[in-house]
């Protein structure tokens, strides 16, 4: 039984939304405050032409727009220190940083990375869920059909098929990549695109001087 009916209709008109193991139901009942903030951030987001064309460096303006919405609501990037103890011997079990974490919700943004980042995210969710550190994982990525917009803006080569998008994500989830962790995914669709004109010089320069980041 799906619990996607708990996702507001306006979000389903803007994003492709899918769930694994009733993730929407888990968010609604176990993490209502975090769920409300996810809805707020995703409702406010728009995919701006100026940011698509200005995108550069190691973290794009698009990623910063979404991450910034969560950080403004006191979500934080987090690295969990995990280990397995057998008798008196401790085995380190390192995890990767989670982009946005609050309560018991882990959220990853994969706008335009190499697709193995999905494997990393799902393995992280699986481990953290099995260790009872999180109740649910959320991934925000892009819909594959945005490629037509990128091509029209001369950015098609920057968003190849082997980068992170919805069609690359779901075979991994259905193949068990996230284990038993409930996972909710949002894919940014053309319905969110706004042609606000080409980027200003300030936007271009701002994209070029961003500090080194692992996510784009």
Task: Describe every region a protein language model picked out.
Residues 143-216:
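Domain-level recognition of nuclease-like catalytic cores that cleave nucleotide substrates
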Residues 108-117, 146:
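Short beta-strand-loop-alpha-helix junction that forms the active-site gateway
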